[in-house]
Regions:
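Short amphipathic alpha-helical interaction elements located at domain edges
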Residues: 1-73
Length: 73
């Protein structure tokens, strides 16, 4: 498979056939697929990465923040 980089939210939603790529990413992490989560995050463009952090802090339970944030750096 070709590596995917610098993808927008819309591109990722289409590619993975999901309505909300950020929800999909969080669910992937919560299901224990940590490596897959990291790959999904790295595929996002810079602006989408910022939007993901906003989503994380506003829509995801705080108990998950620390571990998910560690995976983004």
């Amino acid at each position: 498979l070709m590596k995917r980089y610098s993808r927008t939210v819309a591109q990722q939603c289409r590619y993975y056939e999901v309505n909300n790529i950020f929800e999909y990413m969080v669910e992937t992490y919560q299901n224990g697929n940590i490596t897959t989560f990291g790959e999904l995050y790295r595929e996002l463009c810079k602006e989408a990465r910022k939007d993901f952090i906003d989503f994380l802090l506003s829509e995801v339970e705080p108990i998950y923040w620390r571990e998910i944030l560690k995976m983004t750096v």
